Curated annotation (Swiss-Prot):
GO biological process, one term: negative regulation of apoptotic process
Pfam families to which the protein is assigned, alphabetical: SH2
Gene: SOCS3
Protein name per UniProt: Suppressor of cytokine signaling 3
Record's subunit section: Interacts with multiple activated proteins of the tyrosine kinase signaling pathway including IGF1 receptor, insulin receptor and JAK2. Binding to JAK2 is mediated through the KIR and SH2 domains to a phosphorylated tyrosine residue within the JAK2 JH1 domain. Binds specific activated tyrosine residues of the leptin, EPO, IL12, GSCF and gp130 receptors. Interaction with CSNK1E stabilizes SOCS3 protein. Component of the probable ECS(SOCS3) E3 ubiquitin-protein ligase complex which contains CUL5, RNF7/RBX2, Elongin BC complex and SOCS3. Interacts with CUL5, RNF7, ELOB and ELOC.
Role summary: SOCS family proteins form part of a classical negative feedback system that regulates cytokine signal transduction. SOCS3 is involved in negative regulation of cytokines that signal through the JAK/STAT pathway. Inhibits cytokine signal transduction by binding to tyrosine kinase receptors including IL6ST/gp130, LIF, erythropoietin, insulin, IL12, GCSF and leptin receptors. Binding to JAK2 inhibits its kinase activity and regulates IL6 signaling. Suppresses fetal liver erythropoiesis. Regulates onset and maintenance of allergic responses mediated by T-helper type 2 cells.
Ranges of residues in domain SH2: 46-142
Known tissue expression: Widely expressed with high expression in heart, placenta, skeletal muscle, peripheral blood leukocytes, fetal and adult lung, and fetal liver and kidney. Lower levels in thymus.
Naturally occurring in which organism (per UniProt): Homo sapiens (Human)
Amino acid sequence: MVTHSKFPAAGMSRPLDTSLRLKTFSSKSEYQLVVNAVRKLQESGFYWSAVTGGEANLLLSAEPAGTFLIRDSSDQRHFFTLSVKTQSGTKNLRIQCEGGSFSLQSDPRSTQPVPRFDCVLKLVHHYMPPPGAPSFPSPPTEPSSEVPEQPSAQPLPGSPPRRAYYIYSGGEKIPLVLSRPLSSNVATLQHLCRKTVNGHLDSYEKVTQLPGPIREFLDQYDAPL
């Protein structure tokens, strides 16, 4: 699914501008969910705010497949769009915000459950392959939803079967792989260290053992990407 943004161009991420928001919030909790998502996205360094679909295509045109960014959606029903460079060019996927969670928009005819997350960063991380895993799986033989979920053909030895996702666009079946975010600015050393620490904290007990100020700093951005 390809979208085209109607928002004004902007090369860098910037504070939330409510004048650009055409979609209304369904509740106070949804408003808070989106505000928190924007705050973390601005910390991420790969939130390009109001760049257009055409500008996203230009930004990703010279990048390898798997490079991605998050931008504001042009669709009045959605807040964010995931733009990703695939083996068949740049594709734009809307990020839905419903029922207090975010998910990638999928084919409504699909009976498969769509992964949902309380944070856009968690959604992005879910679709990224683990370290050492092959980037692009072989397409399944049976068609499914627009972003369907199928077992990977060759999981790593000793690891559970990976899930592979595919984009169905214009009759094409394209692997959805998020390998590397496209940075919109230079990350601080503190942020780089925080991402590294987040990637090594695999249990809540480890987090509770850290000093209070460090825990608070990590809570402000709790993703390894």
